[in-house]
Amino acid sequence: RQLVEFLLRTGSIDSRFTGFDRANEGARIHRRLQKAAGEGYAAEVFLSGEREAAGIPFTIEGRADGIFTDEAGVTVIDEIKTTAVPADDIAEDMNPCHWAQGMVYGALYGRQQGLEKLDVRLTYYQIDTDDILRFVRHFTLKELEAFLQDLLEQYAPWAQRQLAWKEQRGVSLSALDFPFPAYRPGQRALAGEVYRACTAAPSKSGVRLFCQAPTGIGKTMSVLFPALRAIGTGCGEKLFYLTARNTTQSAAEDAIARLRASDPKLALRSVTLTAKEKVCLHPDAEGHPACLPELCPYANGYYDRVNTALKALLDDGTGRFRSEERRV
């Protein structure tokens, strides 16, 4: 799903159709439809396959909402989608991502089972009226495989970029030096415990560490520095530093800035997650985010622009990227 949505996403952000409650409701409807489909309907089928594009090996994984055999003996991949779009406006080609997701599952399942042809069915459930609409398309395995291969070829430049970045980051972080002339009392011991926790067996997956230290010891750097060094040795991909207050958030940002200042060539990307109420570029009259395409120029057509903006952000290593210029 992530592969398909990353490459094929289009349209606008619309807060009316997103959110935690909406996702939970969608999951409940999925289970209801799957249960009603009967005994011959296999729900939540895990699929995995190995492919290669541009010399890069890929492992594609996902869960098909349902797989069954129809009356003609044809295997059908069922993709269920809940929607708030009025039933009269639901069209077969409403969202290319929906078909693409089912087609990728079809390619994986078809090769796995040695099938020559498969059908993909989209099942739309209208959440306000309980209407159910279904659309079916017929494919050969060759067509589905070609579609998946084309997606991977499109994604390959992004994968190459990420692989190159990981290699650069690993070399940089593994050689990271402590950014101060000396450790404070107790700071080295804490940093050592953090590093051992991050690199502990099995398979360098780490263990839990609970620690308590007095104010002024330099806890932020004592945690960030060894954790980043551990990432440089292949232990983990991302570091999440959670804070309860803005003051401790600033301490983490200052520590990252200090690390960068001590090594101008440091290969490190950091992101501060902030409530959208605080960073919204186009709030409504009451100062609240208005994530509706008809009200916000940033929400309108957002998914048509986001990948171009993301590439520009990754290409700009100086942090001068401005979302206003890209309207994202």
Positions of the model-derived regions?
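Walker A/P-loop NTP-binding motif
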Residues: Y195, T220-C235, A255-L259
